């Protein structure tokens, strides 16, 4: 539920409090399920 390292809070993404930066948009990261999947599975979480 809290940001870790360079990953935003999944709660903030779900509730719309996170907005992608220009670098995020250029890399194809926009609010939605894909970003949440990357937050949860993008590191050593699973």
Curated annotation (Swiss-Prot):
Residue segments, region Disordered: 1-21
Gene Ontology BP terms: cell wall macromolecule catabolic process; chitin catabolic process; defense response; polysaccharide catabolic process
A Pfam family that the UniProt record links to this protein: Glyco_hydro_19
SUPFAM superfamilies: Lysozyme-like
Induction notes from the record: Constitutively expressed at low levels.
Enzyme nomenclature, EC number: 3.2.1.14
GO molecular function: chitin binding; endochitinase activity
Reaction(s) this enzyme catalyzes, per UniProt: Random endo-hydrolysis of N-acetyl-beta-D-glucosaminide (1->4)-beta-linkages in chitin and chitodextrins
Keywords noted in UniProt: Carbohydrate metabolism, Chitin degradation, Chitin-binding, Glycosidase, Hydrolase, Plant defense, Polysaccharide degradation
InterPro entries: Glyco_hydro_19_cat, Lysozyme-like_dom_sf
Family assignment from sequence similarity: Belongs to the glycosyl hydrolase 19 family. Chitinase class I subfamily.
Free-text function comment from the UniProt entry: Defense against chitin-containing fungal and bacterial pathogens.
Protein name: Endochitinase 3
Species for this entry: Arachis hypogaea (Peanut)
């Amino acid at each position: 539920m809290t940001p870790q390292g360079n990953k935003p809070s999944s709660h903030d993404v779900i509730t719309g409090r996170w907005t992608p930066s220009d670098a995020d948009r250029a890399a194809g990261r926009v609010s939605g399920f894909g970003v949440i999947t990357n937050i949860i599975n993008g590191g050593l979480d699973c």
